[in-house]
Structures are given as C-alpha cells and as structure tokens.
A protein has these predicted regions:
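Conserved S-adenosyl-L-methionine
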Residues: 168-272, 277-287, 292-296, 327-328, ...
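Extended hydrophobic-aromatic, low-complexity segments
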Residues: 279-283, 323-324, 333-337, 353, ...
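Non-catalytic, mostly N-terminal accessory regions of nucleic-acid modification and defense proteins
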Residues: 1-189, 248-261, 355-358, 382-388, ...
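Conserved Class I SAM-dependent methyltransferase catalytic core
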Residues: 11, 18, 27-40, 233, ...
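Short, contiguous acidic/charged loop-to-helix segments that flank catalytic cores in large enzymes
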Residues: 22, 281-303, 328-336, 357-363, ...
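Short, surface-exposed amphipathic charged segments that create phosphate/polyanion-binding patches used
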Residues: 266-268, 366-373, 414-420
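Accessory, often C-terminal, charged low-complexity segments
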Residues: 276-298, 305, 338, 343-346, ...
C-alpha cells in the first residue's frame, strides 16, 4: 500500500478544500501552488540574503547577481512572504498577491510566463478563506531540503488534484510509478530529453530523480518540452523552478502540431503521455505536407494517436529512444493507421510494446499501452553512467509484455506499479536487449514474448501483445480488439435497424394524420 501523507500535507490539502464554494475544484491547484511557490521562493531568498550579508556585508544584499548565481530568485520587497503575511487579513490581499507574483516574474527572466497574471483579484475569494490558506502555507518549513519537502508537497498536491478531478480532468499529471517505469526502461542518463506534451513537467522531474538515484550527473541532461494549455504550462514552469531544474519549454504555451516550439530538435530521449484518441486535431486540409510525416501516410483527422507517434519519430536522434503512452486501440487500428504502423515496424523502430494494468490513471480506468521506440536497434557498445553496455542486434524483433497481473491497491480504486514490479519489467527488458540474452532472457507465458518480424507480418502487423504472448488463462488470450470490433459492428447494425423501424412507425402515424414530433 502507498504510504499515507504526513499531517502537514493533509492539513494543507484540507485548507485548500476550504476554498470549496469560493472557486471551482479545478482551480484549487492554481490557487494553492502559486502561493506555495511564493512561500518557497521567499524562504530561499531570505536564506540567501542572510548568507550574503554574513559573507560580503549589507551593501551587497540587493545585488541580483548574488542570488541568480546560486539559482535563487531575487524578490523585490512587495514580493516577499513576510509582506504578504503582514497584510493577510487586509481586504486587498488578493491584489497584493497578484502584485507579488508579477514583480517576481518581472525581476527574474527565467520565470517569464510561469506565474499567474492578475489571478487572485479575478477569483474574488473571500478574504477570511484566503487568509486561512496563507496561515496553513506559512507553517511549512521549506528549509528541509534534505528530505525534499518542497518537491514532496508539490508532487503530493499535483497527484491529489488529479485524483480529485478524476475522469476527463487531471491530464496535467502522469502517476509517478508510470514515469519511473519509463525512465527505468529508457535510462536517460545524459543527452537531450524531450516531452512534446509535458503537462506539469512530471516526466522531467522523475527522470532527473532517476539519474540522481543511480549516482548520475543531472547537469548532463538537457530538457526540452512543450505544453498546449496555458495554466498547465505555468504549472510546469513553477514545478521545475521549485526544484532548480532548467528547461526550454518554448516561448509560450502552444499546440505541438500547429506551432512546434522545437522544430529542429533531435532528442536522445523522449518521454510522453499524449491525450488519448484526440479527435479533430487538425483540419482536413491542414498539415497534409508536414515534414514530420515524411515517409509515412498523413495521420487521419479522426484520431491524433499516430500524429503523436510520427511527431516523436521525427524528433529522435540517430540513437534516440522514446517511451510514451497511448490508448490500446493504436495497436490494431486499420486503414491509414495500419499503413503507418506497418512502416514503423518495417523501419525497425518498434522495440517493445507493454500493456499496463487497468486503473493506473486518474483520468481513465482503461488499460493503456507503453510503446518503446528505438532509432538504433543494431549491435553496439554504449556507455551508460560510467558502464559499457553491449547491445545485441534486435532489428527484426519486438518484445511484447503484459503487466495486467501486476500492481498493488492505491487510493481506494486505483493501483500502482510497485518498485519490485518495475524492477522485474526493467530487468526483463534489459536482458532481452543485451548481448548474451539467451542466458538471461526467456519467453514467459502470460508475461513476455520476443516476436520476430515474420511473426508480426503473419498476424497482419497488429501489435496487440495477446496475439503473441502465450496465455494459460483463456480469458487473457481473448483478442479483445477483434471482439470489440465485432460487437461494435453488431451494435451498429442493431441501431440502424432501430432507426429504420422508428422512421417507419413515424411515417405510419403521419399518414394517419397524427404526426409525432421528436
């Protein structure tokens, strides 16, 4: 079971919940996290200010360079937490908070576009409720850097907000266990890391934690990302700033397809959780000759899944690796998607397809797929975190894995992949990749199977793992996609018959002079 949150975190959440009735629940995160950022930045500023005074004297305490050199934001007087708390009970406290955030952003170019603009004044929150929230945030000791209290609280809130918002919301957040799994598989120790739909920046945060955990050097990782939603773009910038992580998220929040902020980027690692089954993502005559589709069919307007895949492929460097999530339908879609999928397989880009357990996500209860693409599946030696890894040639092979039997209960109806679950998956994947895999890897019924190109071609280039992995349990070996398509066709026929019968009945009544209006 997941560990329970600390009383401090719970108290902060309950304080945020007091906003109920004043603002929409979907706004909680923006109200709370911006204030939390203000408290954090102010505490760091005051600590640095005291250190400068002790080392260099009072006359240097307002020289901005003495702050920025240590990744500390310089705060003008009206932006400091002490000033906010002195005025917490005043009727114009919302305006003072807006002014504080504005002046911080103006004084620190790295925060351009990160903080909300005139936000608290527009919300019109009751002064007493806002003061209560400020009091709760004021109790947080942000000096506890050893235990990463800042990151922990921020992460707790992002997850809690995603849980509270539930289906159809919370797209800004990918559960930590999934991000950790992707990082453990693609191992982004050094080079360029890119996320084309970065949400609140969780992929970046967990990737750098992975590097730290394995005694790597975070400075060797350059981060690039893009986010479409303006409020989530700001969340990402704050989330990264809180941890002192430098990142290029583009000039502004923007649509990755129509306003690519990193057109010439070639990334060594790509991690992504794109919106599932995004419809009408481009107009019929839009992006038809986009260079990202070069060598492939143009992805259909009805579903963006393969648009995301080809965007990712176009960004991979010569030895680039990508790990991203998609709805299961992308494994076996027909028509244009099948043509694109076949070409991806023929081009030796698909490395692994991993079905995840249901109920991992806060936004959907369906099972989703983790895709691993690799630009270079040839035999070679690679230096990773000070160790030389010898990879075998895997050009005409794809590893299929099924994790639906994994996961432990988490937050009532959800599950999470445990550390031991992730370790098993990563060990299996890396054993399959590496030289001498015949001794370390084997196909395991109901878990994994290494399929040849010929096997995949024989099955019509479907990437549904259950078509390859051996299942003893007959329910698991059921071709879910084929069954669902059959049911879909049957239901469509029944609905068509119903519509015809309804039309015939209405016509009879009309002819009798008793027209029924529907």
């Amino acid at each position: 079971m997941a560990k329970k949150s600390t009383p401090m975190e719970e108290a902060l959440w309950k304080s945020a919940d007091k906003l109920r009735g004043s603002v929409e629940p979907a706004e909680y995160k923006h109200v709370v996290l911006s204030l939390f950022f203000l408290k954090f930045a102010s505490d760091k500023f005051e600590t640095q200010r005291r250190m400068i005074a002790q080392k260099h004297g009072e006359k240097f305490i307002d020289i901005i360079a003495f702050y920025t050199k240590d990744n500390v934001f310089y705060l003008p007087a009206a932006s400091r937490w002490s000033y906010i708390m002195e005025n917490a009970k005043q009727d114009d406290i919302a305006l003072k908070i807006d002014t504080a955030l504005y002046t911080i952003e103006k004084a620190n170019p790295a925060l351009k576009g990160a903080l909300p603009d005139n936000y608290y004044s527009r919300l019109g929150i009751d002064t007493s409720k806002l003061a209560s929230l400020l009091d709760e945030i004021n109790r947080i000791n942000t000096d506890d850097s050893e235990n990463d209290i800042i990151g922990r609280v921020y992460e707790y809130f992002l997850g809690k907000f995603a849980l509270a918002e539930g289906k159809g919301k919370g797209e800004f957040y990918t559960p930590k266990c999934i991000v950790n799994l992707i990082a453990e598989l693609i191992e982004p120790y050094d080079g360029t890391l890119y996320d084309p739909c970065c949400g609140s920046g969780g992929m970046f945060v967990q990737s750098l934690k992975f590097v730290e955990t394995h005694s790597g050097n975070k400075r060797k990782v350059s981060i690039y990302g893009q986010e479409y939603t303006s409020t989530t773009f700001k969340l990402a910038k704050m989330n990264l700033a809180i941890r002192g992580i430098s990142a290029n998220l583009g000039e502004t929040a923007a649509n990755t397809f129509t306003n690519d902020q990193h057109k010439d980027l070639k990334a060594d690692y790509i991690m992504a959780n794109p919106p599932f089954n995004q419809k009408e993502w481009r107009a019929d005559d839009e992006l038809t000759d986009d260079p990202r589709w070069s060598g492939y069919e143009v992805p259909p307007t009805s579903n963006a899944n393969y648009g995301w895949i080809l965007n990712i492929v176009s960004k991979l460097s010569q030895n680039g690796v990508a790990g991203f999530l998609l709805a299961n339908g992308a494994l076996s879609d027909d028509g244009t998607e099948l043509k694109i999928r076949r070409r991806l397989i023929e081009n030796n880009l698909v490395e692994a397809i991993i079905i995840l357990p249901r109920n991992l996500f806060y936004t959907t209860d369906i099972s989703v797929t983790l895709w691993i693409l690799n630009r270079n599946k040839k035999a070679r030696d690679v230096e990773k975190n000070g160790e030389t890894i010898r990879y075998r040639g895997r050009e005409r092979e794809i590893l299929f894995m099924d994790l639906r039997q994994m996961g432990s209960p988490f937050e009532k109806k959800y599950v999470e992949l445990t550390e031991s679950d992730r370790a098993k998956v990563a060990a299996t994947y890396h054993a399959w990749q590496r030289d001498g895999h015949g001794d370390a890897y084997r196909n395991i019924p109901e878990f994994c199977y290494s399929a040849s190109f010929d096997e995949v071609a024989e099955k019509g280039f479907t990437l549904v793992p259950s078509r390859y992995i051996e299942f003893i349990n007959r329910d698991e070996t059921l071709d879910f996609d084929t069954k669902m398509k059959s049911l879909q066709a049957e239901l469509q026929g029944l609905l068509s018959e119903e519509e015809k019968s309804k039309a015939d009945l209405l016509e009879v009544f009309r002819e009798l002079g008793y027209e029924i209006k529907v």
